[in-house]
A protein has these predicted regions:
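Nucleic acid-binding interface residues in structured DNA/RNA-binding domains
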Residues: 2-105
């Protein structure tokens, strides 16, 4: 059942992990799924990010595997938040993951 049980437990685990991503670093949905022990759950991580209403969870630090941002924040909002933290972007508007990918440490 959505909204409880295993889904909420998974979402809580996602939020706890995302809270550990420091300013200036990013992680992909798939990377977080792998860290949570379920490498095929990248879409579920995305659902958790979209559903997040928990203060203090820096959802803007989670991007797609190719470094692209999501329009869920509104046009340009995620990019502005990341740039304010010093996250570099490529000429085509993607996060330069090589320099800012969070390693989970």
């Amino acid at each position: 059942v959505f909204g409880g049980g295993i889904y909420m437990n998974f979402y809580e685990r996602v939020y706890e992990l995302v809270q550990r991503i420091p300013a200036g670093k990013c992680a992909s949905y798939g990377q977080l799924a792998l860290m949570l022990g379920n490498p095929r759950a990248s879409r579920a991580v995305g659902y958790a990010m979209r559903a997040c209403r928990t203060p203090g969870v820096p959802c803007h630090r989670v991007v797609r595997a190719d470094g692209s941002t999501t329009p869920a924040f509104g046009p340009g909002v995620q990019r502005a938040l990341l740039e304010a933290e010093g996250v570099p972007f490529t000429a085509d508007g993607r996060v330069e993951l090589g320099g800012c990918r969070w390693d989970g440490a």
